[in-house]
Amino acid sequence: MATRPGPLTEWPWHRLGNFKYVVMAPVVAHGARRVMRNGWGDLDIAFSLILPSLLLRMIHNQIWISLSRYQTARSKHRIVDRGIEFDQVDRERGWDDQILFNGLVFYAGYLAMPSVRRMPVWRTDGAVVTALVHTGPVEFLYYWFHRALHHHFLYSRYHSHHHASIVTEPITSVIHPFAEHVVYFILFAIPILSTIYLGNVSAMGIVGYIAYIDFMNNMGHCNFELVPEWIFQIFPPLKYLIYTPSFHSLHHTQFRTNYSLFMPFYDYIYNTMDKSSDELYESSLKGTEETPDLVHLTHMTNLQSAYHLRIGIASIASKPYSDSAWYMWTLWPLAWLSMVLAWIYGSSAFVVERIKLNKMKMQTWALPRYNFQYGLTWEREPINDLIEKAILDADMKGVKVISLGLLNQAKQLNGNGELFRQKYPKLGVRIIDGSGLATAVVLKSIPSDAKKVFLRTGTSKIARAIAIALCDRGVQVIMNEKEVYHMLKSQIPENRASYLKLSSDNVPQLWIVHNIDDNEQKMAPKGTIFIPISQFPLKKLRKDCTYMSTPAMRIPEEMKNIHSCENWLPRRVMSAWHIAGILHALEGWNMHECGDEMMDIEKSWSAAIRHGFLPLTKA
C-alpha cells in the first residue's frame, strides 16, 4: 500500500480474495454457450486465445519467479545483496491481478470491435508497426509518466507502493495500484490499437507483444544479472534499446535515475541515467564467489511439497505447509509429473534458500526425493549416495557444518549420519543431526511441575536422552512398550531406574510421542498434551487434546532473508535440527553430532538462548 493511498488504489475484486478468478466467469459462460449451440468450430481465434493466453502468462511469470529465487540463492551474479521478508511477499501476493484485468479488457474489446474476430494468425507488417509504435510513443510517454509518478503528490499516493520493494523479484514489476495499471494498459494498448486501425492486426502479434512486455518486466526485476556482455559488443546500439536487470535495479535503490521502461535511450537523452549503471552491470556480471558457513540438507515431503519450497510458489511457501488446502489438489497432476522427473533425473541436491545471521551465511539444499522414497528398501543406497555427494560437495566448498534434516538422518538409512563419518574420517565439514538441541527443546516444553509422563517414542537416541533426563529429574516415565522399556532401563543409573515404569494403566495426560497412529491417539485420556519428538507433526485427530509443535524455536530478528516457512512450521520458526547446525557453526564446535554422539543438552540450549533463539508456545 502507498504511504498515503489515493483513489482507485485497490483492485475492484480485492474483497473476493482467492475467489477473484470468478470475475472471468462471463468469458467462460460466453464460450460455453457458443460451443453448446454451434460446436467448437464456432470459436474464432481471437476469442479462443483469451483464456489460454492468461494461463500462459501466469506460467511464464511463475517460471521467472522460480528462476530468480533459485539464482539469488546460489548465483554469484546477484545484484542487490540484501534479503526480502514476509511483508514483501504478502504485498506482492496479488501479482496475477493485472493478468485478470487484461483478460477482462480484452474480452470487452472483443465484444466492442467485431473486426478483430476475423484477424489472421500472423501479419509481419503488423509486428513491425507494433515494434515502431512501442519504441516511439509508448516508451516516450511511459518515461514522462514515470517521472510524474516520482513527484511527491503521485509518489506518496500511488508509486510508493511499488518502490516499497527495494530488493526486487520478477513479480515486483507488476505490483502497482489499480489506477497505475489502468494507465499502463492504455499505453500498451496504443500499438495494438494502431494495428487494428491500420488493418494489420494479428493474433500472434498481440500475444507476442504482451509476452515481450512480461519478459522484459520480469527480467528487469529478477535481481541477478543475466544479459551477456558479448551482445553489446556485437551490436553496441543495443545498449540504448534494451535495459539490463542491474540498470533497472538502480532505479529501485537510487529512486531518481533510470526511469525508462525497457529502452535506456530516453534516460540518455534526458540525462537521467545513473552514472554507476555500467559499473554495476560489469561487477554484477563478474560476481563474487561465496561460500556458506552452514548447509542444511532437507528434501521434499509429499507430492505437493515441491510448491512449498522457496523456489516454488511464493505465496504458498510463505505459509505453513498444509496438504488440506483445496487449491493444492488442483496442482496434483503437475506435482506428480515433477516427482517422476526428479526421480529419474535428480542426481544431486539443489539450493533452495540463502539466509544470513549477522556475518554468517547459510544455505538450504534439498534432495530431489520424497518421503515415500525413503521407505523403499531399494532406494536407500541411491539416497545415501545423494547425501554423500552433498556432504562431499559442501566439504570441497569449505562449508564448516552440514546439518541433516528430516529423513536424511534416519537411523535405518545411515545411522543418524554415522555412515558418512566412518567412510570419510578426515572430513573437514562437521556432520550434525541436531539431536542434542531437539532433546533440549522437548525437555523445556514439559511443565516443570510434571510428576508423570507417558513415553511412546521407540528407541531413538533422542528418546533415550529424554527418558534419562526425566528420570534424573525425578519424573515418573511410564511406558507400554516392553522391549523398549527393558532397553532403556539398562541405560538408566540404578538409583534412578525406579522412575521408569512399564504399565498400561493410569496413563497420565502428558504424552511424549514419536509417530503414533490414530488408534493410539484415541486411547489417550481427555485433555492429553501431545509433545512430539519427531521432525514430522502429529495428525491432529482429537479436539479435546492439545498438540505441541515439533521441536522448534523462534529465530532472532537479526536473521535475514526469511520469506518462506520451513515445512509446517509458522513464520520465522525453525526446526531444532536446523538450528543445531547454526549453533555448531556460530560456536565453532569441532565435534560431529551423528551416530550415537550427542551434544550436551544444556550446552545446546544455553547457546540457542544466547544467540537469540526463543522457545515456542503450544502449536
UniProtKB/Swiss-Prot annotation:
It is an enzyme of class 4 (lyase). It is found in: Endoplasmic reticulum membrane. Residues 138-272 form the Fatty acid hydroxylase domain. The keyword Cytoplasm does not apply. One of its GO terms (cellular component) is endoplasmic reticulum membrane. The chain crosses the membrane at residues 45-65, 94-114, 126-146, 178-198, 325-345. It is a multi-pass membrane protein. It holds the Pfam family CER1-like_C. InterPro entries: CER1-like_C (IPR021940), Fatty_acid_hydroxylase (IPR006694), Sterol_Desaturase_Related (IPR050307). Keywords: Endoplasmic reticulum, Lyase, Membrane, NADP, Transmembrane, Transmembrane helix. It comes from the Eukaryota. Expressed ubiquitously at low levels, with higher accumulation in developing panicles, shoots and flag leaves. Its EC number is 4.1.99.5. Induction: Induced by cold and abscisic acid (ABA). It catalyses: a long-chain fatty aldehyde + 2 NADPH + O2 + H(+) = a long-chain alkane + formate + 2 NADP(+) + H2O. GO terms for biological process: lipid biosynthetic process; response to abscisic acid; response to cold. The keyword Isomerase does not apply. Identified as LOC_Os02g40780 in PubMed:17138699. Belongs to the sterol desaturase family. Aldehyde decarbonylase involved in the conversion of aldehydes to alkanes. Core component of a very-long-chain alkane synthesis complex. Homodimer. This is Very-long-chain aldehyde decarbonylase GL1-4. It comes from Oryza sativa subsp. japonica (Rice). The gene is GL1-4.
